[in-house]
Design a protein with these regions (language model features):
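Short glycine-/polar-rich loops that comprise or flank the Walker A/P-loop
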Residues: 87-90, 110-112
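C-terminal structured domains
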Residues: 30, 41-43
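Short Lys/Arg-enriched alpha/beta "domain-start" segment
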Residues: 2-36
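Divalent-cation
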Residues: 83
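Internal, well-ordered alpha/beta segment that forms a basic, Gly-enriched binding/recognition surface
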Residues: 95-155
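Active-site beta-strand-loop-beta-strand hairpin of nuclease catalytic cores
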Residues: 55-66
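Active-site ExK catalytic segment of metal-dependent nucleases
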Residues: 64-72, 93-95
């Protein structure tokens, strides 16, 4: 829920991630490693992680892979991603609110780095699930950031 008490939907957090609609200065994982986002990836409307082909650095390492988004840390396990190999390529778990007692691990028992967005948001204006989803679809159709070329040539 937002501070106003209005419900927040996962699609809204996905929209925020897709548009990078947050203060990206000083981004860090919940365990303190610096994050730099080069590309948030492409929104996946099918099975599997929420965003594919994301590019980012965590600490001194560069990553290319998937990003999964949830309202809270517990969403990872609640949705069964810890038991689904389709989520083994996730490089970052983005949540609105971090829950310290909910570790995020894939089927290979590797811990997935987590980013809590709440401290980086200026204001969270709740939108309906339908509004957020429609906006994500429009973002997906934009050719910005060399989108057309990347989509046609991305491995």
């Amino acid at each position: 829920m937002s501070r106003s008490g209005a419900p927040i939907y996962e699609h809204e957090i996905q929209r925020i991630w897709a548009e990078q609609d947050f203060d990206s200065s000083g981004l860090k994982t919940v365990d303190g490693k610096k994050i730099e986002v080069f590309s948030p990836g492409w929104w996946n409307q099918g099975q599997g992680p929420d965003f594919e082909t994301a590019r980012l650095s965590i600490g001194d390492d560069f990553f290319y892979g998937s990003v999964e988004v949830h309202l809270q840390s517990s969403g990872w396990k609640a949705h069964g991603h810890n038991r689904n190999p389709a989520y083994d390529q996730v490089i970052l778990h983005v949540v609105l609110y971090h829950q310290p007692r909910h570790g995020v691990f894939n089927t290979l028992e590797n811990q997935i780095p987590e980013l809590e967005l709440a401290p980086h948001l200026k204001a969270l204006k709740p939108q309906s699930q339908k509004q957020s989803k429609e906006r994500l679809k429009r973002i997906e159709q934009l050719p910005g950031r060399c989108g057309v070329w990347i989509r046609e040539n991305d491995p």
